Amino acid sequence: MTRSRVELGLRENAAQFALLVAVNALVGAMVGLERSTLPLIGEDEFGLSSTAAVLSFIVAFGLAKSLTNLAAGVLAERAGRRRLLIVGWAVALPVPLLIALAPSWTWIVAANVFLGVNQGLAWSMTVVMKIDLVGPERRGFALGLNEAAGYGGVAVAAALTGWLAAEFIARDVLVVAGFAIAAVALLVCVLFVRDTAAHVALEQARDHAGTRTTAPRLRDAFPDATYRVRALRACSQAGLVNNLNDALAWGVTPLFLASKGATVGEIGLIAGLYPAIWGVGQIWTGQWSDSIGRKPLIVAGMLLQAAALALLAASQGALGLAAAASVGLGVGTALVYPTLIAAISDAVTPVARPATVGVYRFWRDMGYVVGGLFAGVLADAIEFSGTIAVVAGLTLLSGLWVAVDLRTRAQQAPRLATPPSRTP
């Protein structure tokens, strides 16, 4: 594509947009492979008895992904989006090999460090590149489709892996599927995906003339998205709590259901139901937030997640109630997930977007670290139901924080992540 033909918009960039949607489905599938089986493998194959030890792989994954998000946000403007996307998929190739050869749980933890880097680079770049392509008018819709594809991939992979693990050796299923996904995605990115630098330049020149044209430094973007700007800090804490909930669903829920007598197949279905609802729902919630604003959906979604977790805590492992809780958690997350990134993107200019989104995604994915540590230690102390109930209370408080701290889109003018008066 030549510079003279560069345009912003979903229709104008339909082919590349669709390709990035497909790539993100593979990103989601890569992590979805572990959803229904890896905690059980920790107990059955490696003899882990402590929930905190089992959840160590989630802590490693979350820490690696969080730090990679932070680096990716800064490197995107320097190295290019496409290049980071390709590197992200190259890093995924050792994951199935480490799982296949693992003589101890330490190797599984190491594999999840590589998986976290893969997710941080590949998912971050598909998010930013879609925003680059469509421009500001369809931002929520673009993010909804992106997250729908990613978590649709998570759901399908989780359900299929749970079913296949009931018929075959669980570790073999992870290895074969993981290598196939990584290899296909890497080839697609190398051969067909194009960079979006020209689209960024077009939006910056068209909609943000007179603002700074260089990306902010991390030392400026980090405090903005962490505490300095009300809208950004509200989104960052909500993202962290949202992924704390996801860590709970990933690591604690399979163990909770297994302790109540659920089979691997039943656990796989419930583990897949939550991200399936989450994934499909985002097709509409992202676009809905373009119409009514970001704040109502974020607040409602956090409160619904809190209610769903409370139901799961009270279910005592009854599959019908657990399934209903999984649906509620999926709907609540669908309301929140794409809308938070859209709210972040509303508040900054195109050149500041990768760094600011990277900081947000750092805090959001630190939820896996906090969730893995907190839920693991708490589950060892007060059992699974009490742990889930405590997290439900934290989610309620997070939703109330957003209600107080996040302004409506009409009240919030787009701003630089770093004020123009500062030197770059």
Give the location of each predicted region:
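Symmetry-related core transmembrane helices of the 12-TM Major Facilitator Superfamily/SLC fold
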Residues: 173-190, 388-403
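Helix-to-loop junctions at the C-terminal end of transmembrane segments
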Residues: 68-80, 281-293, 379
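Residue-level signature of mid-helix packing/kink "hotspots" within the transmembrane helices
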Residues: 62-70, 155, 275-283, 368-369
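Structural signature of the two symmetry-related core transmembrane helices
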Residues: 83-97, 179, 296-311
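Cytoplasmic helix-loop-helix junction between adjacent transmembrane helices
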Residues: 111-150, 343
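Juxtamembrane intracellular "pre-TM" segments in multi-pass secondary transporters
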Residues: 1-14, 195-235, 419-424
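C-terminal transmembrane helical hairpin of 12-TM major facilitator-type secondary transporters
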Residues: 295-340
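Helix-loop boundary and gating motifs at the non-cytosolic
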Residues: 11-62, 231-234, 238, 242-260
